[in-house]
From Swiss-Prot:
Family: Belongs to the GlnD family.
Gene: glnD
The name this protein goes by in its record: Bifunctional uridylyltransferase/uridylyl-removing enzyme
Keywords: Hydrolase, Magnesium, Multifunctional enzyme, Nucleotidyltransferase, Repeat, Transferase
A single MF term (Gene Ontology): phosphoric diester hydrolase activity
Cofactors (names): Mg(2+)
Record EC number: 2.7.7.59, 3.1.4.-
Domain HD residues, every copy: 436-558
Comment on protein domains: Has four distinct domains: an N-terminal nucleotidyltransferase (NT) domain responsible for UTase activity, a central HD domain that encodes UR activity, and two C-terminal ACT domains that seem to have a role in glutamine sensing.
Keyword Nucleotide-binding in record: no
Domain ACT: residue ranges: 673-757, 785-852
Family matches, as HAMAP family: PII_uridylyl_transf
Length: 852
């Protein structure tokens, strides 16, 4: 590299470092962009002079660099423009110039050609056309640059350009769906991200308006409040993107789990109020994109309407204050929301009631949103406003869209201060994937879908139950309030009771409705916890659950709320296994509340009799049946449900001496039920678990039982790996049975801890602290409940079983609740030694070491 270029490169590095240092000190986005742009242009000037002295060509900045918005590791977008077609010699010259840019580590993205060639190249290329919309002259022949800009502007069909950018934005938003996009969002392309702000400015510039927010304010396209809020949202997002590049040392636009703590720390966020610094960062991010979405929803239709051909305008009178224009509602006088604030909810009420109205007319929306920022205590205390807000839930029609609309524009948070505290609040607990406010609205949506016949095919039984439930509005409110106290520290279910009762008192709910609402908020986790963590075949567990529930109305409401909550937490959590657990508990509790299962001994006797009837129909002699029941023992009927007993009995009754493996695919599910019957021996449970883990199965539930003649009868529910299609299940079943049969007949089975599953980035960088509780069971001497919460990983249950064995603890029952990347396991164990605090402490420490 010539000496003069080496000097220019060194100067560039110094200026770039100075720009970064000034930014980190002053924390001003505009200063960084200005100084970094100047540094790049200084280097480009030297390179241009070296390669194109006295040339007819010109160099233009396009795209983000043309906009004056260069991020630390982004491409430098350039165009080399010629007044005439490029000769071979000029093309070689341009190639050498581009290579020098790479040598200087500028990461160039360069277009080159004549004016006509470049115009033709972007005729059907919306991305290229957009890049040249940002073009600005740098060096060389200015006349050529002006000619290109003029021809581009003449060629561009403004209306078509705007429509194409809006379609592009829709596609971009559609790609930003799913848990990955929520948890590790792309700062640039996510809904409400930087690209949405750019799109707004491109639409403005394409029609001859200013291309920046201050000038759009001067042109009265934006109000002062709109310009201020949009600028604030833009600066927040730009800060995050700059810090992301600086910490990643690459052009990384996704807030990856491993980068979130680094970016948060560099921006000065601290762990506080039991929230991680990364959660604080993500909350700032979600609020910023929400602001951009708010203003985009108002400003984009307004800018579009300035140039788009208007469809035939159909206007209908609604009442003295409102008209319908096509599918939108418009206020006759937009100052009505300031003069008569009760219309802030009235217009939403009309929109909710009318299926032929889908939106507010842009100018009406703008005025309405401006008025909503005046919502205060006086507005809340107005009885008409309270009646209308409660009416949104009583109506049910369009409830999800109504609440999402009110949340997007900040109305829920202004009307209910408790709601404002959860907006954008993300929980790094390895199973929630949405901010709390979005999760709550997803749960409301799920409850509402159960009430609509058009969605009954999704969950037929739950839908039928919901459609016959009298107090649907209370269920919607329970979904709305169930997590409203998240993030305050302490038990959010208990803390939410006060919010729910205050709302009920203020919004004309009866005492009975208030009691049901408060009970559902307090107990919204009860059914999930019992179904997924406890042995519902144990009459004591069922009795305790029913004492909490007390009525069939509460049971039905809790069942419906629980289903909707799980489905709204993380799409991966809802599966046939969880559905069957909840349904089993619902029906068992229903019988218990009706008084049909009040006597445990009668229940156990009925289970035995059902199995005996089956065997009798199969012509099994009574003497043979009796031998089987004696071998299994009376405790067997207390520990297994009827369907398991029938399955076991059919397979064991003819000969219960040889080892047996049986499996069956559970109906409408991606799970197998597996039974293993063999002579008792050391570490059998752990070794069986390792076989399942090596095959990639998740163990959902396990029941370890020892017969009277010292055989194990272990029953597992295992989930088939998601990459397998249902048509593969029989082959998978055969392979699993073959290995298990080899094991039970004494053949050596490898115990290597190898499987293809990898721990996710989220688990590695956002782990949860493992926790263990050991509690004696009151009615059963030497029996203990062990509760474990930890990051999910292969072989976890096998490792836990090894620890139990090493401490002389007998595992009787395991209930595995896998919540995406988090597990909440419940074990019932037997050990006289655990009365000794030292031994109990030793067990706990050993378990923690395995979980670390």
């Amino acid at each position: 590299m010539p000496e003069n270029l080496s000097s220019a490169l060194e100067t560039f590095k110094q200026q770039r470092n100075a720009a970064e240092a000034h930014y980190l000190k002053a924390n001003r986005v505009s200063v960084f962009f200005r100084e970094y742009t100047a540094a790049v242009e200084t280097l480009l000037a030297a390179l241009w002079a070296e390669h194109f002295q006295n040339s007819a060509l010109c160099l233009m900045a396009v795209g983000g660099f043309g906009r004056g918005e260069p991020y630390p590791c982004s491409d430098v977008d350039l165009a080399v423009v010629s007044p005439a077609p490029l000769s071979d010699g000029i093309q070689e010259q341009i190639a050498r110039f581009i290579q020098t840019l790479w040598d200087c580590k500028l990461m160039p993205s360069v277009k080159s050609g004549s004016v006509d060639e470049l115009c033709e190249s972007v005729r059907d290329d919306i991305t290229g056309d957009t890049a040249f919309l940002e073009a600005r002259f740098l060096f060389g022949n200015r006349q050529t640059a002006d000619e290109l800009a003029e021809k581009m502007n003449v060629q561009r069909n403004v209306a078509a350009f705007i429509e194409a950018k809006l379609v592009e934005m829709e596609h971009r938003h559609a790609k930003s769906q799913g848990s990955g996009a929520v948890l590790e969002p792309n700062i640039k392309s996510c809904p409400g991200g930087l690209r949405d702000i750019h799109t707004l400015l491109w639409i403005a510039k394409a029609q001859g308006l200013a291309a920046n927010l201050p000038d759009l304010l001067k042109q009265r396209i934006l109000t002062r409040a709109e310009a201020g809020m949009l600028s604030h949202g833009y600066r927040r997002l730009a800060h995050i993107r700059i810090r992301l590049h600086l910490n990643a040392k690459r052009a990384e636009d996704r807030l990856l789990f491993d980068l979130q703590p680094q970016v948060a720390e560099s921006m000065g966020y601290q762990d506080e109020n039991r929230r991680r610094q990364s959660e604080e960062l993500m909350r700032v991010f979600y609020r910023a994109v929400k602001t951009v979405k708010q203003l985009g929803g108002i400003l984009t239709p307004m800018l579009r309407s300035r140039v788009s051909s208007t469809p035939v305008r159909v206007t209908l009178r609604i009442d003295d204050d409102y008209i319908q224009v096509n599918n939108q509602i418009a206020a006759r006088h937009t100052d009505i929301f300031f003069r008569r604030p009760e219309h802030i909810f009235k217009i939403v009420e009309i929109m909710q009631q009318r299926n032929d109205i889908t939106a507010l007319e842009p100018q009406t929306l703008r005025a309405w949103w401006g008025a909503t920022r005046k919502i205060n205590r006086s507005f809340y205390q107005n009885s008409e406003n309270r009646r209308r807000f409660a009416g949104f839930f009583r109506s049910g029609n369009g409830l999800t869209q109504t609440l999402r609309f009110l949340n997007l524009y900040g109305v829920l948070g202004r009307y209910l201060p408790a709601w404002e505290k959860i907006v954008g609040l993300l929980q790094h607990d390895l199973f929630h994937i949405y901010p709390v406010d979005d999760h709550i609205l997803a749960v409301v949506r799920n409850v509402r879908r159960l009430a609509l016949d058009m969605h009954s095919h999704e969950l037929p039984y739950a839908s039928a139950l919901m459609q016959s439930f009298e107090k649907q509005d209370i269920l919607y409110l329970a979904a709305f309030f169930h997590d409203i106290a998240k993030g305050r520290g302490g038990d959010h279910a208990v803390q939410g009771i006060a919010d729910a009762r205050q709302f009920a008192a203020d919004h004309f709910l009866t005492e009975e409705e208030s009691d049901l609402l408060a009970w559902l908020v307090e107990n919204h986790l009860l059914m999930s916890a019992v179904a997924q963590k406890e042995d519902i075949q144990d009459p004591g567990v069922l009795d305790a659950f029913c004492k909490r529930v007390q009525t069939h109305e509460r049971l039905s409401a809790l069942y419906l709320l629980t289903i909707s909550d799980i489905r709204g937490t993380n799409p991966k959590l809802w599966n046939a296994w969880r559905a069957s657990l909840l349904e089993s508990l619902f029906h068992a509790a229903g019988r218990c509340l009706a008084g049909n299962d009040g006597n445990p001994h009668a229940l156990f006797g009925r289970r035995r009799q059902e199995a005996a009837d089956l065997l009798t129909r199969a012509a099994v002699p009574e003497k043979q049946q009796k031998k089987l029941w004696n071998a299994l023992g009376s405790a067997y009927f207390a520990r297994h449900q009827s369907r398991e007993i029938l399955w076991h009995a059919a397979n064991l009754v003819h000969d219960f001496e040889p080892p047996i493996v049986r499996s069956r695919i559970l109906p409408q599910s991606d799970s197998f039920q597996v039974m293993v019957f063999m002579p008792n021996g050391p570490r059998l449970f752990a070794r069986l678990c390792r076989i399942f883990s090596r095959h990639g199965f998740d163990i959902l539930a396990a029941r370890a039982f020892i017969t009277e003649h010292d055989y194990i009868l272990d029953t597992f529910i295992v989930q088939i790996p998601s990459q397998h299609a249902p048509e593969d299940y029989p082959d998978i079943q055969s392979a699993l049975e073959a290995e298990l049969n080899s094991f039970i007949h004494g053949h050596t089975v490898a115990e290597t801890q190898s499987c293809n599953r990898r721990i996710s980035r989220r688990s590695r960088y956002m782990p949860i602290a493992p926790s263990i509780t050991i509690t004696p069971e009151e009615d059963y001497p030497d029996r203990y409940s062990v509760e474990i919460t930890a990051v999910n990983r292969p072989f976890l249950l096998a490792d836990m079983a090894e620890v139990f064995f090493a401490h002389n603890v007998s595992l009787r029952y395991a209930k595995i609740s896998t919540l995406d990347e988090r597990v909440e396991d419940s074990f019932t164990v037997f050990s006289p030694d655990l009365k000794n605090p030292k031994i109990q402490s030793s067990l706990k420490q050993a378990l923690l070491e395995q979980l670390a």
